[in-house]
């Protein structure tokens, strides 16, 4: 795989710069950390990367080659500088969903991308920012705030890098470049297990917690305190209490066997559910496929209903190639086992749209379509590019409707293609030819597989406890709500301290006085972050003002003409303030009319959900057609697999409307209370005799 990259470098008459992946970012390698991210990234691109001979929608692309010391491979790291003023998406959805809607729009974004292995020798495509198939995609704004967008290790298709190696590299890269804060949306899964729930209960933090990522904000109104309480509630469950609560339930026998096995292995040191999960994860990390735990292997027992056979007949072709024949799977089955954040129904619909595009091309006598062409055609019907990328990634040797979908890489262009074949033809092609049979002389009784015993498959034991204890605890609202709170906590953040190891300069964290920019609203209450400004030790107040102006003008769109007039904490003497102090500045030249003001955009939408959410958290929402307030579909009783109704009225507007209708439909006179009834012997006296009305009410009470 690395050869084409080197050949490309030779053709461009430049010597490639190659850096060790495992050492990258450590101890000043390849660059020393001396300042803010906006300065560090420029040094990095100048000294450690080479400009590619193509661009993405007019944006410059750099490439740095990384060598893996144990896999003997070269890995390309692409860096793309996105100019916000010329971007089709100037606002940052990741900022908005992590509570940074009030951050000023920065002038530049830097994308760090390691593509999937099969695309290492290919140029980045125009839709590279939207793809979810990259091994690594990180985004950092020029102010040092950024996001880890996606990580796909060996579980997700990478042949060279596991998830831990990828995040290790990203963490060192961020530290070397002087990143301020990085967020991540933790959707990591191990097959069907949500790792943020499993690791949260076992270790008290998410899978990303080992790199210092902590709770940032929860979806559906979950707070940091609720998240921490939920982790403590589940982790502190007593194992004995769990056994008692499951009682005589069908699955209690298996659960008790797992408890007993690992308790005996730990010599009785496991008391709580956290102790048990942590112990099992430690065992799992040290277990090898060749050497299982010292327990009975998977039982293979004879079936009493099968006739024994002393000989097994196999075709010659099967003996040689029984593992090489392709396996066709129905895509509905594949989609159901993917564990995707999209509903299965949407995955199947997207697959059907893709197949229709391939059928249209086949009708024109074209032999297949490139991945990009398929994607572009499907986008006419489905706007969610992330969904399309996810489905395309899983479509190979799958049956959709009456056709078989296959993909292949063109050996010349190295471009991925998709083709379809009628199912009948595919079945005929798969049927083996009749060949002479050979006899295997060994006696092979027919056997069936029975369930594993505890300890034979640690992951299977974890899955048993995860499914039953965490997801289906019997009759416990506490466990159910705690589990849901952890699952609804997806956004985590890591903050790097200000680097102050340079004795030759002074650094200050400078923020504009809030009275100059009204960024507060019902959605956001925190002020935008301060910006790191560096000046020499001998700098004067005038020098500091000049440095602040240059920094703000270079970083934020609305501050291109900003002029500093005053620093609240400094008058004339710089010696009164120390390095790393926070400063508040005043001035003029702020473009308050600019659309590129805050990352939340210039729309005046409002979020006010019954779950207490007051800002966009990235979850599915719907707007009331009357009051235009946004609420979560889940909180409104709309399932994720359901389509949005064409007309939606929230419960508050429904209640107001119902109250108005009730007033309209009520009788003209209210039913009298005991205070204003003069004469009333029965209900018939009130409703049946109009002549009594004058005696019943001292005065008329009109409702409208």
Curated annotation (Swiss-Prot):
<dbReference type="GO" id="GO:0043565">
    <property type="term" value="F:sequence-specific DNA binding"/>
</dbReference>
<dbReference type="GO" id="GO:0005634">
    <property type="term" value="C:nucleus"/>
</dbReference>
<dbReference type="InterPro" id="IPR001965">
    <property type="entry name" value="Znf_PHD"/>
</dbReference>
<keyword id="KW-0862">Zinc</keyword>
<keyword id="KW-0539">Nucleus</keyword>
<dbReference type="GO" id="GO:0010628">
    <property type="term" value="P:positive regulation of gene expression"/>
</dbReference>
<comment type="subunit">
    <text>Interacts with JMJ16 in the nucleus of male meiocytes, especially on pachytene chromosomes.</text>
</comment>
<dbReference type="InterPro" id="IPR011011">
    <property type="entry name" value="Znf_FYVE_PHD"/>
</dbReference>
<dbReference type="GO" id="GO:1990188">
    <property type="term" value="F:euchromatin binding"/>
</dbReference>
<dbReference type="GO" id="GO:0010032">
    <property type="term" value="P:meiotic chromosome condensation"/>
</dbReference>
<dbReference type="GO" id="GO:0000791">
    <property type="term" value="C:euchromatin"/>
</dbReference>
<dbReference type="GO" id="GO:1905821">
    <property type="term" value="P:positive regulation of chromosome condensation"/>
</dbReference>
<feature type="binding site">
    <location>
        <position position="627"/>
    </location>
    <ligand>
        <name>Zn(2+) 2</name>
    </ligand>
</feature>
<dbReference type="InterPro" id="IPR013083">
    <property type="entry name" value="Znf_RING/FYVE/PHD"/>
</dbReference>
<dbReference type="GO" id="GO:0051321">
    <property type="term" value="P:meiotic cell cycle"/>
</dbReference>
<feature type="binding site">
    <location>
        <position position="609"/>
    </location>
    <ligand>
        <name>Zn(2+) 1</name>
    </ligand>
</feature>
<comment type="function">
    <text>Probable transcription factor required for chromosome organization and progression during male meiosis (e.g. microsporogenesis). Necessary for fertility and meiotic progressive compaction of prophase I chromosomes to metaphase I bivalents. Together with JMJ16, promotes gene expression in male meiocytes in an H3K9me3-dependent manner, and contributes to meiotic chromosome condensation by triggering some condensin promoters (e.g. CAP-D3 and CAP-H).</text>
</comment>
<dbReference type="GO" id="GO:0042393">
    <property type="term" value="F:histone binding"/>
</dbReference>
<dbReference type="InterPro" id="IPR019787">
    <property type="entry name" value="Znf_PHD-finger"/>
</dbReference>
<dbReference type="GO" id="GO:0007060">
    <property type="term" value="P:male meiosis chromosome segregation"/>
</dbReference>
<dbReference type="InterPro" id="IPR019786">
    <property type="entry name" value="Zinc_finger_PHD-type_CS"/>
</dbReference>
<feature type="binding site">
    <location>
        <position position="650"/>
    </location>
    <ligand>
        <name>Zn(2+) 2</name>
    </ligand>
</feature>
<dbReference type="GO" id="GO:0000976">
    <property type="term" value="F:transcription cis-regulatory region binding"/>
</dbReference>
<feature type="zinc finger region" description="PHD-type">
    <location>
        <begin position="606"/>
        <end position="656"/>
    </location>
</feature>
<dbReference type="GO" id="GO:0003677">
    <property type="term" value="F:DNA binding"/>
</dbReference>
<dbReference type="GO" id="GO:0000212">
    <property type="term" value="P:meiotic spindle organization"/>
</dbReference>
<keyword id="KW-0804">Transcription</keyword>
<dbReference type="GO" id="GO:0006355">
    <property type="term" value="P:regulation of DNA-templated transcription"/>
</dbReference>
<feature type="binding site">
    <location>
        <position position="632"/>
    </location>
    <ligand>
        <name>Zn(2+) 1</name>
    </ligand>
</feature>
<dbReference type="GO" id="GO:0048235">
    <property type="term" value="P:pollen sperm cell differentiation"/>
</dbReference>
<keyword id="KW-0863">Zinc-finger</keyword>
<feature type="binding site">
    <location>
        <position position="624"/>
    </location>
    <ligand>
        <name>Zn(2+) 2</name>
    </ligand>
</feature>
<keyword id="KW-0469">Meiosis</keyword>
<dbReference type="Pfam" id="PF00628">
    <property type="entry name" value="PHD"/>
</dbReference>
<feature type="binding site">
    <location>
        <position position="611"/>
    </location>
    <ligand>
        <name>Zn(2+) 1</name>
    </ligand>
</feature>
<dbReference type="GO" id="GO:0007140">
    <property type="term" value="P:male meiotic nuclear division"/>
</dbReference>
<keyword id="KW-0479">Metal-binding</keyword>
<feature type="binding site">
    <location>
        <position position="635"/>
    </location>
    <ligand>
        <name>Zn(2+) 1</name>
    </ligand>
</feature>
<feature type="binding site">
    <location>
        <position position="653"/>
    </location>
    <ligand>
        <name>Zn(2+) 2</name>
    </ligand>
</feature>
<dbReference type="GO" id="GO:0008270">
    <property type="term" value="F:zinc ion binding"/>
</dbReference>
<keyword id="KW-0805">Transcription regulation</keyword>
<protein>
    <recommendedName>
        <fullName>PHD finger protein MALE MEIOCYTE DEATH 1</fullName>
    </recommendedName>
</protein>
